């Protein structure tokens, strides 16, 4: 953990953006999940990527990004150029699941 804190200090000092791809961050066989880099980032330098394919349904290929708005706008543009959009049905199903059930409790199962 000490090394991670030092890493955050360095990227903060030099304002280096970091992409944290964390598909397995919520999955643990025992103990608490480890904190993400994003949770320790005070300057908004860490761009966090997550996926529903590991915690809900492997076939969905549906994820999310946590970043500042100016970065998200660029991500959206690149995504639209690359593949237009993810499956609308998958997006609706995941949205309904999140609305109806506690996603954190589902992940703990």
What are these regions (language model features)?
Residues 21:
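Glycine-centered flexible beta-alpha turn that most often forms the glycine-rich phosphate-binding loop
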Residues 1-15, 24-55, 68-69:
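Active-site pre-lysine segment of PLP-dependent enzymes
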Residues 42-108:
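Conserved core segment of the aminotransferase class I/II
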């Amino acid at each position: 953990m000490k090394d991670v804190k030092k890493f955050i200090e360095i990227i903060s000092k030099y304002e280096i953006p970091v992409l944290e791809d964390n598909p397995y961050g919520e999955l643990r066989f025992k103990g608490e999940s480890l904190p993400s880099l994003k949770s320790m980032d005070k300057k908004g330098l860490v761009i966090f990527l997550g996926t529903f394919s590991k915690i809900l349904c492997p076939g969905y290929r549906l994820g999310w990004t946590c970043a500042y708005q100016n970065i998200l706008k660029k991500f959206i543009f690149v995504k639209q150029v690359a593949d237009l959009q993810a499956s609308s049905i998958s997006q609706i199903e995941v949205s309904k699941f999140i609305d109806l059930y506690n996603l954190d409790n589902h992940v703990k199962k």
